A protein has these predicted regions:
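Hydrophobic membrane-insertion alpha-helices, especially the h-region
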Residues: 14-39
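Early extracytoplasmic/lumenal segment of secretory-pathway proteins
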Residues: 42-120
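N-terminal Lys/Arg-rich, disordered targeting/topogenic segments
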Residues: 1-12
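Periplasmic-binding protein-like
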Residues: 24, 320-327
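Extracytoplasmic "Venus flytrap"/periplasmic binding protein-like
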Residues: 92-231, 235-236
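Extracytoplasmic/secreted proteins, especially bacterial periplasmic and envelope-associated proteins
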Residues: 63, 67, 95, 99, ...
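A bilobed periplasmic-binding-protein/Venus flytrap-type ligand-binding module shared by bacterial periplasmic
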Residues: 259-261, 265, 271-323
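Composition-driven low-complexity repeats that form or flank extended alpha-helical/coiled-coil segments
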Residues: 238-247, 251-255, 259-260
Length: 327
């Protein structure tokens, strides 16, 4: 039997109708897939809340994931947040930097749990004694300053400084105002929806409902800020001064919020975010114990989140404090 492949035989094969039909079907499938990809509504950075867990911590617990799910389903966030994600760097191994950088560059980062502990990678010997050049907060600041908010309430351009200015634009004085400028909020909301061509708010009915949710969002931010100020004043949490140097640049500011400066008031935090500390027992043996002492949170400024939606981070942190603090 002659099984030689020739141009004539190939031409005959391609002329079969069934092959043409299959080819047309494949082409149509690719075409519709392309159309769907180009027109599908994508989740914007402001609609996704992402929590990072530093590699020095223990892996995120089941309690943490349950609580984050409850926060999303409940009323912790505003209407804008529709999904939550996590990046647990304890599982990244040697790819920590790659994973972190890739997420930051596409604006998928809101807060990070990070302990105020010495960074072993900065160890050095002096007079026969091991010392450390930095703790984890300082090391992280040195490498990621451009992605972090300064949390100092009095520093212009900082997270809480700008939040207070944002709220005062609607309240006059956010601390003691009894009314809120709902008309201004609605106007700003409608202008933003039009500018962004937001498909969620096309009809007048959708816009009216969205404006009401926007008013509630601003009110949430105000309530959360006042609560946090109370927590700081009472010593439940505390701002951490962090100083670091990168090349010729010196950084100094309140770049972290210590969620557990006192275990008597925030020890429950260890159910959600924790690290292992060495404890020497009466028998002289070392064991590891789960703790959240000096567990901090840093706020990411990824620039991709639309103005004012970065304050969803505050809503989550206040929720966590209220969940964990001692009664």
């Amino acid at each position: 039997m002659d099984a030689k492949i020739t141009k004539t035989r190939i031409a005959h094969m391609l002329s079969y109708d069934w092959l043409k039909i299959v080819g047309l079907a494949v082409a149509l499938m690719l075409f519709w897939n392309l159309i769907f990809t180009m027109t599908a509504t994508r989740v914007r950075p402001s609609q996704q809340f992402t929590v990072f867990n530093h590699q020095a911590n223990r892996p995120l617990s089941e309690d943490f994931f349950n609580d984050l799910g409850d926060a999303l389903q409940g009323d912790t966030f505003s209407y804008e947040v529709i999904e939550t994600t996590t990046n647990d760097l304890t599982e990244a191994g040697e790819y920590v930097s790659i994973l972190l950088d890739s997420r930051l560059k596409i604006h998928e980062a809101d807060v990070m749990f990070i302990p105020k502990l010495v960074d072993p990678s900065t160890a050095y010997e002096e007079n026969g004694e091991t010392k450390y050049k930095a703790n984890y907060l300082q090391s992280f600041l040195r490498s990621n300053r451009s992605y972090l908010y300064d949390l100092d309430p009095e520093k212009e351009g900082g997270y809480f400084y700008e939040l207070k200015a944002y709220l005062n634009g609607y309240y006059g004085n956010y601390k003691n105002a009894e009314t809120i400028d709902e008309e201004k909020i609605e106007k700003d909301f409608r202008d933003r929806a039009k500018k962004n061509k937001d498909k969620r708010f096309k009809t007048e009915e959708q816009l009216a409902l969205g404006a009401q949710k926007e008013i509630e969002r601003v009110q949430k931010y105000r309530d959360a800020l006042i609560k946090l100020e109370g927590f700081v004043e009472s010593g439940i949490v505390a701002f951490e001064e962090v100083e670091a140097q990168s090349m010729e640049y010196q950084f100094k500011g309140k770049f972290a919020l210590n969620l557990c400066p006192n275990k008597d008031t925030m020890d429950e935090l260890k159910k959600y975010a924790s690290y292992s500390e060495k404890v020497v027992g009466e028998d002289g043996k070392e064991t590891l114990r789960k703790t959240a002492k000096d567990m901090c949170v840093m706020f990411f400024d990824t620039k991709g989140t639309e103005e004012s939606f970065e304050y969803e981070s505050l809503l989550y942190v206040v929720h966590l404090i209220e969940t964990c603090r001692a009664a």
